[in-house]
Structure formats: structure tokens, C-alpha cells
């Protein structure tokens, strides 16, 4: 599609329903707002906004943030709304694409007409889906690392990057180390963590207890299981980061967080929305469909059950063949063909993903291969 790098998908943790990236427009000048992953706003005064290209805005953001040249490869400009995400090519004109947003929603989403009419995208400066994650840890600039860290943290907290409990606690401990003071055995950290737990752990791991026991626990009481596990993980991080009494630089903790995220299969992915057939249940019951997220990176494809938040399928590109079809008057389909070991001989499998973004997913897979 003209206007994207194939990385169009469902919105992530930074989605906002009442944002706009054009705060005012004069005869020649305009105030453009570009959002960072941590919700910081970068205001830009630009001229000839309708003809301005993404590359020019990208350079302006880098200049304001005083980022090194490597940021040109690491980050990209995205148009983001609650309904759709689009990574822009350098030659794209963001203002023009913003005006075409309803057409993009109709083409690539199944959103109701009322939602399409109300939706408005904003500009975001965030990770380029085509930047190899192996190069990140070689970056010396602390501000670049911080921006990558903030984006990864947001994806973990929003459960977009699925993690087991142990990984979530280890990542949460690194966030504690960045945000809070040095751990001390007599520090009343349980209270502090209890109040800020959703800043360190995904929502499903930090739901506060309900009822009488929660009321009796009080602010000065002992930490609950989630808080205590996070405290224990935080203490381990502190012990590792202290070297002869000298605290490690923030860049070290950013790298540690990113390195941990690199082990997650979803890091650096573009996310798409689709549906797959449910297995038929019983003689008279039709299977129906279930909603899925399709995560595509430079390394492979993962299909995630959107409701249950678990991985249905994970494949490296060497393990699959793919195609997409767009039958007339039917939903486009992305086909994934792969082998699975049945215990004796490999069995050929075929997964059918119904999605208006099938063509985009196919194009991204082709690019990555």
C-alpha cells in the first residue's frame, strides 16, 4: 500500500482516542505534536505542512531530542489511533495520510462506521519494525536506549509482549531499579510498590486483593505475594548492579531490560488483527471463529489468542510457506503452511487467517524473508 512499509496493524499500549498531532494551522506555519512512547510530547513549528514528508519531520524530532544519526535507522514515524497503526515511509506525507485516514480504516479494518467517523490518528516517534534487535545493544547513546526501553516497557505492561510470571517480575524489578531508590532491608518498599504496582507489572499480575483481608492489611502491613516477589527480584537486581558501592549507570539497566525483552518472541513485531476458525466441538456444534493477533518480526510469525492471551502458533520463516488470497465478496485470507511432528512422521498443516490486513501481512513476510 502506498503510505506504509507493510506494518499496518492493531493498536498497542500507546493508543489514545482524543489526540491530535496538528494543534494549530496558520497561513503558512503549523504546530505539529509528535508523541513519544512515554507520552512525552515533542512540539514542532513547521511550514508547508501538507507537503512535508515523514523524513523531514523525523529529522526535526531528532534535532529537538539531540539524538545521534543512528536514530534515523532505529526509529520511524507512525500514524496511530485506537483502530489502526501505520509505519510511515520516509517519502510519505503525514498530513495527506491523516486526511485519508477514513479510507484506510475502511480498507484495513472492520470498524463500524460511527467509530471510523470519530477516529483521529496522531504521530508517534517509535521503534522501526525493520531495525534488527541485535544492533540495539551496540548503541552507546543513553537517550536512544531510554526511548527503546520506554516503548518495550509499555508493551510489557499492556501484555502485548506476553511473558511468564518470572519474566514479568524480573522486568518489573529492572523498572523499579530505574525509577526508585536503592533497596534497603528496612525500606518500607511494600507500601510504595503497592501504590505503584501497575507501573511495574502487567494488570493481570497486580490486581489488588478485595474484601476483608485487603482492608485489614493496611499501608503498613507486610507485602502481598505479588509485591513480595517483586521486592525479591528487585533485591537481586540491586545486588548485581552494585559493584564495590558504585551504582551502575541507567544505560546499563536499559540494556538489561532490552536484552531480557529480546528473548521474547514478540519484541520488535508489527501486530495485525485477524480471526481463525475454532475447532468443531461435537456433532451439532459449529466451531465459529476466535480473534487473534498476528505478530510478525524479522525472525518469524506468531499467532496469539487475543482473548486468552496465549500463543497458538510460533514459526520461524524457514518453517513456513505462505500466501494470501482475496476472493470476491469474501474476506481476504492469509494462509500459513507448515509441518508438525505427529510422533511418527511430520504432518502438513494449513492455518487460515481471515483478515482485511492479509495483503499487508503477506508483504511484510516477503520483505523479512
Curated annotation (Swiss-Prot):
InterPro entries xref list: FERM/acyl-CoA-bd_prot_sf, FERM_2, FERM_central, FERM_domain, KRIT1/FRMD8, PH-like_dom_sf
GO cellular component terms attached to this protein's record: cytoskeleton; plasma membrane
Annotated region (Disordered), positions in chain: 1-23
Signal sequence region: none
Cross-referenced Gene3D superfamilies: 1.20.80.10, Phosphatidylinositol 3-kinase Catalytic Subunit, Chain A, domain 1, Pleckstrin-homology domain (PH domain)/Phosphotyrosine-binding domain (PTB)
Pfam families membership: FERM_M, KRIT1_FRMD8_FERM_C
Record-annotated FERM domain positions: 30-369
Name the UniProt record assigns to this protein: Putative FERM domain-containing protein FRMD8P1
Native organism: Homo sapiens
Gene that this sequence comes from: FRMD8P1
